[in-house]
Amino acid sequence: IGMKYRSVYGSDNDTVEKVACFSRACALRNKLNMTTIGAFGGRGMGLTCGCADPSQFMREFGVDIDSRDSMDILKAAEEVTEEEIQDVKENLIKPYFQEMPPDDGCTERSIRLYLAVKKIIEKEKFDMYVIQSFPGLAEEYAASCFTQSMMLQQGIPTATLCDYNNVLTVFLLSNLTPDPVYYGDFQCIDKEKKVVKVIGDGACAPSLAG
């Protein structure tokens, strides 16, 4: 009838694992279909993967890209109340940090940015989102590192610098595990020291630290 399928024979553990893996892949593909990526800003720092063809994403993955200007975030950030800021400090920051961040303008703007983005993605029902951050918000208001870290901690798929390939990967991984996902790039592998160096942009779920 024209449907793609895979034939698997046997009852050993390897065969069962093949069936399980294929089933999970099918479920993920179906879940990815008809999802929406919220895109705040444009390509960050000249990244090639910061550009995406909406028609191709819809054709290949069934994913819609819905763009928003960064000004929407700034407007929402200005509307955040002091009570909301204190709630984040007590319930999101305090449980994960041994020392509270400085009580200054930078910290307040970072929290406001987080709350603004969270409100917008909930209002628009985005399934995942990308954000430019550099250049743009980070220069004019605050870096998105805290925002991204808290979103990853809560299992919300996201990527900075409008990296569309990255956010798709985070979405898939987030649906395969209950644990927070970390995204980073391999910088180097030191075989003698047996060390792999992975770099990111400051975004990491705090529960993964230590």
Language-model segment annotations:
Residues 2-4, 34-38, 151-154:
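Short, surface-exposed connector motifs at secondary-structure boundaries
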Residues 7, 11-14, 49, 102-105, ...:
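Catalytic cores of large soluble enzymes that bind and process phosphate-bearing ligands
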Residues 11-17, 71-77, 189-191:
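A short acidic, often aromatic-flanked loop/helix-cap motif at beta-alpha or helix-coil junctions
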Residues 1-33, 45-46, 195-199:
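Cofactor- and metal-binding active-site motifs of prokaryotic enzymes
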Residues 5-7, 65-67, 158:
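Conserved beta-strand scaffold positions in the cores of enzyme catalytic domains, especially
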Residues 54-56, 60, 64, 109-210:
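Anaerobic metallocofactor- and corrinoid-dependent redox/one-carbon enzyme cores
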Residues 8-10, 40, 68-71, 184-186:
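Conserved beta-strand termini and adjacent loop/short-helix elements that scaffold enzyme active sites
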Residues 26-142:
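A charged, amphipathic alpha-helical module
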